[in-house]
A protein has these predicted regions:
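A structured beta-alpha segment of the ubiquitous adenosine-cofactor-binding alpha/beta core
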Residues: 1-15, 19-25
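Conserved active-site and cofactor/substrate-binding residues in soluble primary-metabolism enzymes
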Residues: 2, 11, 50, 73, ...
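Generic hydrophobic/aromatic pocket-lining and core-packing "Φ" positions
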Residues: 4, 27-34, 56, 125, ...
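Rossmann-fold NAD(P)-binding glycine/threonine-rich loop
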Residues: 20-36, 43-84
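Rossmann-like NAD(P)H-binding beta-loop-alpha module
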Residues: 60-134, 138-146, 153
C-alpha cells in the first residue's frame, strides 16, 4: 500500500514500526498511530532529537509504548537500561563514544602514531569511506552532528531534560592533527570523540556537549576501538557502568528494533 495513514489507523494493525526516517511525515504518522492506540517502534534519531518531547508526551497520554532502542548506539541496550534498569538510580553523568565513524578514524590515527608512523586525517577518512564506515558526505559524523543528536536523546531519557539537537554544543574531529594525537599518546592519553551529558550537583542544571577529549589510557573508554561504541554511566549508587558493543550497522540495528517489537507486543498483550 502507499497509504501510510491508512496503515497506522487500520484497526487490524496492532503495532507500528516507523523506518522512513526524517522528521515529517514520520512525526505525523507516529502521533496518529499513538492516538489510535498503537505502540510504536522507531530508530529515527533525527526525529527524536528534535521533537522527542512531543512524541513522549503523546505516548504517555495514549498509554502506549514508544520504543527507540536502535536510535542510540545500535545494538547496545542503553535506552532500555536508562529507562528500566536504572530508573531508580540518581544518575550524575552519562558519557560515551556514540559515533562509530569518528572512533574508527581516531583509532587508526592513534595506531599510526603508536607504530611510529604519520597520523593523516584525510587519508584515514578516505579509508573509512572505502570500508563503508563513513558516508560519502561525512559531515554529520565527523563534525559531531550525529553524536549531538544521540546525546540529546540520552539527556531526555536519563534526566528528563527537554533537549533538542540544536541545543547541543558540538565540535568534531576534522581539525585534529597528527601532532595532537602524538602529544596525547606521549602523555598517556588517547583522543576520543565523546558525548557527555551531566547534571550539576549544586544547581541541578543539565549540560550536553560533544567534543574530542583526552581519555586516560587506563580508562575503560580508551580501549574502545574501531567502529565500536561504548556508553559509560555514573550514578550515586551504582558508581560506574559501561555498555559496549557495535553501535551501527544493519544487523545490530535490526536486533535492537526487533527487541523493541517483542517488548511492545508483550506489553500490548498484557494490557
Amino acid at each position: 500500500t502507499r497509504d501510510a495513514h491508512g496503515v497506522v489507523t487500520d484497526p487490524d494493525v496492532d503495532l507500528v514500526v516507523e523506518a522512513i526516517g526524517g522528521i515529517e511525515p514520520a512525526r505525523e504518522l507516529i502521533l496518529e498511530a499513538l492516538q489510535h492506540g498503537k505502540p510504536v517502534v522507531t530508530a529515527n534519531k533525527e526525529l527524536l532529537a528534535n521533537v522527542g518531547a512531543e512524541l513522549y508526551a503523546a505516548a504517555d497520554a495514549a498509554g502506549r509504548d514508544l520504543l527507540f532502542e536502535a536510535a542510540v548506539a545500535g545494538g547496545i541496550p542503553i535506552m532500555r537500561a536508562l529507562r528500566e534498569s536504572l530508573h531508580g538510580e540518581p544518575i550524575t553523568r552519562v558519557l560515551g563514544i556514540i559515533n562509530g565513524t569518528t572512533n574508527f578514524i581516531l583509532t587508526k590515527m592513534t595506531d599510526a602514531v603508536a607504530g611510529g608512523g604519520e597520523a593523516d586525517y584525510a587519508a584515514t577518512l578516505t579509508e573509512a569511506q572505502r570500508l563503508g564506515y563513513a558516508e560519502r558526505d561525512p559531515t554529520a559524523d565527523v563534525e559531531g552532528f550525529d553524536a549531538g543528536a544521540k546525546a540529546a536523546i540520552i539527556a531526555t531519557v536519563a534526566f528528563g531534560a527537554k533537549v533538542v539537537a540544536g541545543d547541543v554544543y558540538h565540535e568534531g574531529i576534522s581539525r585534529i592533527t597528527a601532532s595532537e594525537i602524538a602529544i596525547a599518546h606521549r602523555l598517556g592519553y588517547v583522543v576520543k570523540l565523546l558525548g557527555i551529558v551531566e547534571r550539576d550537583a549544586e544547581s541541578g542544571d543539565i549540560s550536553v556537549r560533544v567534543h574530542p577529549a583526552m581519555v586516560p589510557i587506563h580508562h575503560p573508554l580508551a580501549s574502545v576501538r574501531d567502529s565500536f561504541n561504548a556508553v559509560f554511566v555514573e550514578g550515586d549508587f551504582v558508581d560506574s557502568l559501561m555498555f559496549y558493543g557495535r553501535g551501527a550497522g544493519g544487523a545490530p540495528t535490526a536486533s535492537a528494533v526487533f527487541g523493541d517489537v517483542v517488548d511492545a507486543a508483550i506489553n500490548l498483550r498484557n494490557g
